Amino acid sequence: MEAGPSSLLIVLIISVAAGSVFNIQVAAELSRQGAGSTVGGILAIGLAREIAPLLTSCLLAGKVATAYAAQLGTMKVTEQIDAITMLRTDPVEYLVVPRMIAMVVMAPVQCFFFFLAAVWSGQITSTVLYNIPPAVFWGSVRTWLNPGDLPSMLVKALVFGMIIAIVSCGWGLTTKGGPKEVGSSTTGAVVMILVLVAIMDVVLTQVLFGG
């Protein structure tokens, strides 16, 4: 649930704001330079290659990773994990794998919705504020986007989703002590996720777009 509908509204709201703000900055400058016809393409490339997967992963880290780490951390300190183990059930298979599958599936889906909403909001702001015709905007999007940009965006989102699930569940399952340590594990998980996502973003950008 955390990786799906409960996160989608937040992703859509932030995507509309991000697309509008980014496009206002870009469209204002390009319109002054007489290059308003390129606004849509620049926005689409920026979103697909960097902004959409990175911001989506940060939002999911704040919403989903905190929930995963807190849930599993609470189960650990209240000995529910030990009870599951005593029932001859693998806690990783029972608790971690479903969460990982959810993130691997939903992170690319939410990233794709982020991209669509941000481009749409960018088109609205371009037309309303800078009188760029919708046909010109969308023509620029089609011209500038490469066939591999959207698949590469989804690959980034998938990898980031795996990082979020693995790290948050790992920190939750290794929580020791009492309720106070649950909060510490949750904070540590989010910080570690953001660091790993930033590092992996550099690597994936070079691999997917550096050539």
Question: What name fits each language-model region?
Answer:
Residues 12-20, 104, 108, 112, ...:
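Generic alpha-helical transmembrane segments of integral inner-membrane proteins
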Residues 25-48, 116-158, 162, 166-186, ...:
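Membrane-interfacial helix-loop-helix connectors in multipass membrane proteins
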Residues 2-55, 59:
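Active-site cofactor/substrate anionic-group-binding motifs, chiefly glycine-
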Residues 39-82, 110:
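Hydrophobic alpha-helical transmembrane segments of multi-pass membrane transport proteins
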Residues 182, 188-205:
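Final/C-terminal transmembrane alpha-helix of multipass membrane proteins
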Residues 72-97, 179-182:
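Short cytoplasmic-facing helical segments at TM-TM junctions of multi-pass membrane proteins
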Residues 4-8, 12, 51, 55, ...:
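Selective transmembrane-helix segments that form parts of the transport pathway or gating/packing helices
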